Amino acid sequence: MKTSKVEVMEIPTELEILEALKSVKDPEIPLDIVNLGFIREIKIDKEGNLSIIATLTTNDCPMESYIVKSIVGALKDKFPFLKEISIKFDFSIPWNTDFISKEGKEKLRELGWKI
């Protein structure tokens, strides 16, 4: 009798996704995009389709495509079974330093940033 191996896909939690996104560093500010407060919303369905709403420091950020590629790369490395990764930017609430996490502000202060 032949048995087939069934691969079970475990959908990552929002926390696991955020943890993976901490590997994505902003190329200009020495912090990751999670601690910078760039991630506004994460949705994932049971089929493995992921949708992220994010922001950047400005709506004309020259590093947007680099950050998108880095996000997709980090998520595909950690969760190769994800089917679709959609990243949209929302600039309706302009980013400012208030969005930086407490941990992020501490790291920046250690590096000499006045924040």
Predicted regions and their residues:
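Domain-level signature for proteins that mediate thiol-based redox and metal-cofactor handling
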Residues: 1-115
